[in-house]
């Protein structure tokens, strides 16, 4: 067992940009600017370039000031590591522009499934699994939306993510995905979650760490639903949490260990390159090396792996979101450094096996 082409610049927080129709539209607020020249200043060769990897989490973005689509991801995936497949995560990209509001997210599933279909039998099967958005507050009525996703997904639709990231600190809010307080406890939302397992679908949970007890309650109430926690359980170390970092770690780690008691819960190990994580990698004159990343991440990632075990942990790139902090190659190198003492079977689970099982990638 284990012991204890690049995206364009992101716009400033809460910036408004003119839409094509002349309206003002809120743009992304939470993500760091991607600086290709900065990233290129500290590129490393890929460590263990033959190790098979299935990337458990990435997006396509097509927003004002933030473009990262299939060609961009392929460029990163082919930059040295042996990325054999990936799981695509909803990102409000290519929604339908007409029809019932609840069905508009099906456009993203249809687009991603279509544009990646030619890759499914090649060396990099991008979006071998697809996770889309559905408004789970529809309760039992969400089943029609889920069935539409399944039809659009060309056999690759695997689950739903409906963000639940809420905190009393307004500086943590993302204006593109406003979330009400207590969403995980909402009876209508829970009725929607209950529709997933009968269709063989999983639930991806993106929340902030103070909400982990609410997720425990949701997961315990839905033992047949596979719940996959994103980004190490929502580590937040900025805003009102900036001066409480030891307390944050203790509270987070206790909640994650409690959550790990439920066998239907899995965790994605990664996603610690965001502004909210407070590692401040982006402030360096050069990007962090993989050794620096591994050192900074070790307490958090090893806690996840120790609590859940390799059989319920999977590494993720979270690109392009994390690309504001480090390069694709350096990030995966860091994961390899962190697991250098693990057995071959444990590493295979973390880099390929767990995600393949959790999302039924075959």
Where do the language-model regions lie?
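Alpha-helical scaffold segments that flank or form the walls of functional sites
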Residues: 65-125
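Histidine-centered catalytic micro-motifs
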Residues: 52-63, 229-232
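Conserved, mostly hydrophobic/aromatic
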Residues: 57, 86, 130, 196, ...
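Mid-to-C-terminal alpha-helical segments outside catalytic/metal-binding sites
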Residues: 3-11, 18-52, 68-74, 84-85, ...
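Catalytic metal-binding/acid-base residues of hydrolase active sites
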Residues: 59, 92, 135-136, 163, ...
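Structural recognition of the beta-strand scaffold that forms the well-ordered cores
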Residues: 87-88, 131, 159-161, 228, ...
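Active-site gating/metal-coordination segments in enzymes
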Residues: 22-38, 100-211, 217-221, 233-234, ...
């Amino acid at each position: 067992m284990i012991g204890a082409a690049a995206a364009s610049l992101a716009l400033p927080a809460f910036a408004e940009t003119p839409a094509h129709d002349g309206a003002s539209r809120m743009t992304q607020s939470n993500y760091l600017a991607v600086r290709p020249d900065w990233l290129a200043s500290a590129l490393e060769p890929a460590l263990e370039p033959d190790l098979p990897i299935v990337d458990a989490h990435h997006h396509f973005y097509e927003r004002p000031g933030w473009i990262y689509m299939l060609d961009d991801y392929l460029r990163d995936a082919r930059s040295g590591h042996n990325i054999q497949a990936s799981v695509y995560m909803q990102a409000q990209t290519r929604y339908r522009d007409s029809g019932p509001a609840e069905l508009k997210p099906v456009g993203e599933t249809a687009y991603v499934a279509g544009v990646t279909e030619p890759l499914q039998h090649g060396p990099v099967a991008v979006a071998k699994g697809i996770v889309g958005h559905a408004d789970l507050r529809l309760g039992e009525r969400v089943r029609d939306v889920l069935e539409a996703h399944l039809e659009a997904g060309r056999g690759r639709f695997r689950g739903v993510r409906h963000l639940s990231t809420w905190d009393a600190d307004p500086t943590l809010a993302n204006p593109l995905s406003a979330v009400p307080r207590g969403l995980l406890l909402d009876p209508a939302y829970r009725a929607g979650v209950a529709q997933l397992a009968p269709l063989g679908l999983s639930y991806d949970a993106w929340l902030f760490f103070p909400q982990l007890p609410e997720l425990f309650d949701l997961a315990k109430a839905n033992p047949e639903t596979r719940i996959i926690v994103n980004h190490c359980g929502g580590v937040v170390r900025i805003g009102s949490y900036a001066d409480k970092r030891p307390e944050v770690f203790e509270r987070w780690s206790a909640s994650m260990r409690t959550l790990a008691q439920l066998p239907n819960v899995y965790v994605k190990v990664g996603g610690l390159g965001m502004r909210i994580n407070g590692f401040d990698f982006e402030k360096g004159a050069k990007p962090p090396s993989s050794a620096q990343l591994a050192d900074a991440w070790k307490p958090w990632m090893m806690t996840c792996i120790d609590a859940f075990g390799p059989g319920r942990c999977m590494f993720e790139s979270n690109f392009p979101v994390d690309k504001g902090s480090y390069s694709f190659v350096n990030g995966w190198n860091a994961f390899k450094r962190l697991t250098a003492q693990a057995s071959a079977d444990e590493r295979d689970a973390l880099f390929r096996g767990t995600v393949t099982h959790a999302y039924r990638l075959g």
